[in-house]
Amino acid sequence: MEKSSSCESLGSQPAAARPPSVDSLSSASTSHSENSVHTKSASVVSSDSISTSADNFSPDLRVLRESNKLAEMEEPPLLPGENIKDMAKDVTYICPFTGAVRGTLTVTNYRLYFKSMERDPPFVLDASLGVINRVEKIGGASSRGENSYGLETVCKDIRNLRFAHKPEGRTRRSIFENLMKYAFPVSNNLPLFAFEYKEVFPENGWKLYDPLLEYRRQGIPNESWRITKINERYELCDTYPALLVVPANIPDEELKRVASFRSRGRIPVLSWIHPESQATITRCSQPMVGVSGKRSKEDEKYLQAIMDSNAQSHEIFIFDARPSVNAVANKAKGGGYESEDAYQNAELVFLDIHNIHVMRESLRKLKEIVYPNIEETHWLSNLESTHWLEHIKLILAGALRIADKVESGKTSVIVHCSDGWDRTAQLTSLAMLMLDGYYRTTRGFEVLVEKEWLSFGHRFQLRVGHGDKNHADADRSPVFLQFIDCVWQMTRQFPTAFEFNEYFLITILDHLYSCLFGTFLCNSEQQRGKENLPKRTVSLWSYINSQLEDFTNPLYGSYSNHVLYPVASMRHLELWVGYYIRWNPRMKPQEPIHNRYKELLAKRAELQKKVEELQREISNRSTSSSERASSPAQCVTPVQTVV
């Protein structure tokens, strides 16, 4: 049965707007933070938001706070809209790396915060509630043994966090209830924290992506392609964006008939066009051929129009992301794939990328071998058994085939999987990243995510499970994580071709789960419009673009006209240690890598300034030499002695 994709409950109780802070979110903390991964916006904020007002506390906590001055040192820094919901003292965090540490555990409507003053510097654990997958009780009131009674939170970002409570303290029940309430607000008919967060940034990230400007950058519309508003009210396809690019000679009435033959109405529409050959990447869902092998003249004519728009090739390639056996099995459900008999001059290629359930299981296996500890003696065989890198290889290899066919073959391609919102998004966005240097800039990459993932209906709400306690939901899958992993693999092979750094990619993934920003909420453009996210929430790009120096690759050189061909073989791929194993302190660099990036950027700027000064000096000397050469000189007549 099809699961409802509504996200109307995400902001069910919008908070009244608070006076926003205009201070930049800069870190002032020097405490040890073994498990903190938030961007500075999620960890430390301006003094305005670290208010000592009792307004930030539930009434039953005010007495506790006023009676214990030490609590002020143990409380978390609060974001605008954030308030404390519960606090438990004398809780022990069972750290899998450094051992048990005792401190104060605080639950707000945004985060789980643990701080111990027993260590110098203080030990801090800071995790957004959005990252929590499930909360489990450990032991009963009669449990014996040290630290055998408490809570364990299983997280979406690989971690498990375990806290021991004293049975006589009666704090476990209260913390558990508040975690279940605020970590899963959608299940409790409460708003996600993104609807409470009211920070103001210099740039509005919601305005970053303008589809008309992006298509104009690509040279659209032209004589072969037009922009249609047939989906302006999302009536043609409720998971597609309002503006679509389609063949110029196909009228809107025919688009409706094509939509009836494609799964969920997701017709082939243009994602990218080659600036020289006019070869295109179009994306769609599977055709509804069924076991009887149904055909659609309108769909066949439509694909012919796509092929005809490229004068340099008389064929078209259809890349089906699925394994062929899965595509055949989909016929029993009414779906299927394009028959080469029905579609003239079309070649069908299966890319053998597995479905969301296989990927979810692969990530589960990966978590088992990387957290908390790594078994060195069987590391390679254990990693191989997860098949994670094998899946990454197949996705990269598929995108590479698409990019090569467009660039070298000058041939238009059509990409789809079953519904066209998971594997299809991975393939089109990665191929476009290889082909177009614009998408390798920081803002260009943000546009790519907005365009190929958000506007074209990747189901972020269902795949991530924002605020939903149903952790066993079969719709959850690490599809977007795999895409970012593939991007990281490309940055390793082409370290100077990307304007952004690893910290940028990790920040995006952290806020995929955090629910601090509205960027990754809901399942479609239509739903985000209904929820009025641009007005009611802050965009992740607002935060990132306010401090680009943190996310800039110091080695970046402009490769805008270069096509990247990454090597998609197991020998050239590696596990992303900086993301999957970052919680292990033995795997961390002594200094945060983004600090090193800043130093390198400053050094590069200093050297560039010296180069410019030397160039000016050389230019001035050349000018002076030219002036002297052109000025009249005193003539000396040689004296000759004639013998």
Curated annotation (Swiss-Prot):
Oligomeric form and interacting partners: Homodimer (via coiled-coil domain). Heterotetramer consisting of one MTMR2 dimer and one SBF2/MTMR13 dimer; specifically in peripheral nerves stabilizes SBF2/MTMR13 at the membranes and increases MTMR2 catalytic activity towards phosphatidylinositol 3,5-bisphosphate and to a lesser extent towards phosphatidylinositol 3-phosphate. Heterodimer with SBF1/MTMR5; acts as an adapter for the phosphatase MTMR2 to regulate MTMR2 catalytic activity and subcellular location. Heterodimer with MTMR12.
Family: Belongs to the protein-tyrosine phosphatase family. Non-receptor class myotubularin subfamily.
GO biological process annotation, one example: phosphatidylinositol biosynthetic process
Topology of the protein relative to the lipid bilayer: Peripheral membrane protein
Reactions it catalyzes: a 1,2-diacyl-sn-glycero-3-phospho-(1D-myo-inositol-3,5-bisphosphate) + H2O = a 1,2-diacyl-sn-glycero-3-phospho-(1D-myo-inositol-5-phosphate) + phosphate; a 1,2-diacyl-sn-glycero-3-phospho-(1D-myo-inositol-3-phosphate) + H2O = a 1,2-diacyl-sn-glycero-3-phospho-(1D-myo-inositol) + phosphate; 1,2-dioctanoyl-sn-glycero-3-phospho-(1-D-myo-inositol-3-phosphate) + H2O = 1,2-dioctanoyl-sn-glycero-3-phospho-(1D-myo-inositol) + phosphate; 1,2-dioctanoyl-sn-glycero-3-phospho-(1D-myo-inositol-3,5-bisphosphate) + H2O = 1,2-dioctanoyl-sn-glycero-3-phospho-(1D-myo-inositol-5-phosphate) + phosphate
Sequence ranges of Polar residues compositional bias: 1-12, 23-40, 632-643
Short name of one Pfam family: Myotub-related
Broadest EC class assigned to this enzyme: hydrolase
EC code: 3.1.3.95
Gene: MTMR2
Main localisation: cytoplasm
Low complexity biased stretches: 41-55, 620-631
GO cellular component assignments: axon; cytosol; early endosome membrane; perinuclear region of cytoplasm
The name this protein goes by in its record: Phosphatidylinositol-3,5-bisphosphate 3-phosphatase MTMR2
Active site: C417
Residues recorded as bearing Phosphoserine in the entry: S6, S9, S58
Domain (Myotubularin phosphatase): residue spans on this chain: 205-580
Domain notes: The coiled-coil domain mediates homodimerization. Also mediates interaction with SBF1/MTMR5. By mediating MTMR2 homodimerization, indirectly involved in SBF2/MTMR13 and MTMR2 heterotetramerization. The GRAM domain mediates binding to phosphatidylinositol 4-phosphate, phosphatidylinositol 5-phosphate, phosphatidylinositol 3,5-bisphosphate and phosphatidylinositol 3,4,5-trisphosphate.
Keyword Coiled coil tagged: yes
The GRAM domain, residue ranges: 68-139
Keyword Hydrolase among record annotations: yes
Function as written in the Swiss-Prot or TrEMBL entry: Regulates the level of these phosphoinositides critical for various biological processes including autophagy initiation and autophagosome maturation.
Record: residues binding a 1,2-diacyl-sn-glycero-3-phospho-(1D-myo-inositol-3-phosphate): N330, N355, I356, S418, D419, G420, W421, D422, R423, R463
Subcellular location per the Swiss-Prot or TrEMBL entry: Cytoplasm; Early endosome membrane; Cytoplasm, Perinuclear region; Cell projection, Axon
